[in-house]
């Protein structure tokens, strides 16, 4: 790998290992590659190879989060017993402007031409995820974030990449200022990115429904996992305030030692207990008028 041309914008990004089941493997590659790349490879094989250089860029600002993609590329090149020159323009976690090349990849066209599909799949979304994670952590510096990518992604490969993006974006902010950032993810596979051995999480809505009450669900969970911090989902019955206070009173000892949390996972179609649309606006107007006025103004400008 050639030496980086631009210094990183961050102090330190901790080196982490990446899941070793990098896909697609050489046997799977042709079935998930765009046909026109496969046909181009056949043409090059027929009429003669040549040296090429790929410049990979994004059409929008992102955070550089290339390691999974480049690790996969180097794995495939090694399997093919070939060589390429990889020249990174940005260190991991650095700002990348729209249209700026992030990395140059040079080598045999025959070796590289059918790798573009899988390579780009691992770059675009990951870099955007890192950018979004950075924005979240920067905006709410004293908030702990949990990466819940697993159930929202189109497969485990995408979930791995989203967890990595969350890690990079979070580390970027933490290297520059005092911020908590992402403290974990939902699954064991990528927990090491956040210096954990296991995924984090307590209860989905299904457990509250199974238990029949918010308090009963909390009691059942705590009985089963007494040494785990307790995060209680309090919106199942639409009584967020009533159930939230009940949980705090019932688990006062956990609240006192900082291991009790309340979780809201309410969709945008309803409002917190006792409020409706008008009531919600009235609360904002009384307590934080600039928040909703600024939001409305930004919508008008958009």
Question: Language-model segments: which ranges?
Answer:
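Buried, small/hydrophobic-residue-enriched core segments of structured protein domains
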Residues: 2-12, 92-96, 103-298
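Flexible, solvent-exposed loop/hinge segments and secondary-structure transition points
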Residues: 2-113, 117-126
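Conserved small/polar residues in nucleotide/adenosyl-binding loops
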Residues: 300-302
